[in-house]
């Protein structure tokens, strides 16, 4: 048994407590219909899985049909506790780097309380709200739910927090999404398609970096899964001379 497995085993009692707490939260929570269509882009694991870039692309696509799309984000590491409409010139320490990125692409609201945030979006004329994260939240009614899965990582060790990365059990998640969008797998042959998961789709965006092929680079990143970034550079035959990995949303 490796150290990581040992730690997961020791933390497993806390995962049981987490599971009970989540079920109590689900039982007593009541989703509110705010009167505006809501699409949620979420995941099952703590950390990055590609939700933000998917949300950005989804906004671009749906902007042909909806004139006033708001992205609603929790603003991970943002200091402000009250809902706020974010601009590209907002202080990232107050609203988070994630919210700034969304604001550079369109109307954005940062809110720790999703119900209050959704109401602020509606007050400002939103005719569609895209939630970046919040699949497990029961604050507001979601009209359509997209589960994003990184095929390289999947669901980690399949344990709930804190013994593993899962925010909810895999079985309970099967009834908590409309489509599963698998990223970082261009072959369409993920093992997830054989595990009775419904409505599985694949997403891949190819980026040409021919100019960097065989070039020496210093690689650094501050995302949820830095290993994916480094592996992609290696696949592109880029010579990595030095690597510096920062925590997710590093300032």
Map each language-model feature to its residues.
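Conserved small/polar residues in nucleotide/adenosyl-binding loops
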Residues: 1-5
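N-terminal pre-Walker A segment at the start of P-loop NTPase domains
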Residues: 15-24
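C-terminal accessory "lid"/substrate-recognition subdomains
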Residues: 154-251
